[in-house]
Amino acid sequence: HVVAAITALKERGGSSMKKQSVFIKKALKSGVEKGTLVQVKGKGASGSFKLGKKPAAGRTDA
């Protein structure tokens, strides 16, 4: 997703990692909180991440 977002910017001079790192860290943090990403190793944005399990589709107890 991050690569697609940076590619979509189509900046001729490239993108600044310093400026984009804030948004990347925020996206990783929210992904871990929602469960779409799982942090496998490390702390913060320097760790390793993988995709989380998809939640069960619309199951309710009645």
UniProtKB/Swiss-Prot annotation:
Keyword Cell membrane: no
Any one Pfam family match given in the protein's UniProt record, by short name: Linker_histone
Gene3D superfamilies named among the record's database cross-references: Winged helix-like DNA-binding domain superfamily/Winged helix DNA-binding domain
Entry keywords, A to Z: Chromosome, DNA-binding, Nucleus
CDD domains: H15
Alphabetical GO biological process terms: nucleosome assembly
Keyword RNA-binding: no
Protein origin, superkingdom: Eukaryota
Example of a GO MF term: DNA binding
InterPro entries the UniProt entry points to: Histone_H1/H5_H15 (IPR005818), WH-like_DNA-bd_sf (IPR036388), WH_DNA-bd_sf (IPR036390)
H15 domain: residues covered: 1-53
Function: Histones H1 are necessary for the condensation of nucleosome chains into higher-order structures.
Sequence similarity: Belongs to the histone H1/H5 family.
Protein name: Histone H1.2, embryonic
Annotated source species: Parechinus angulosus (Angulate sea urchin)
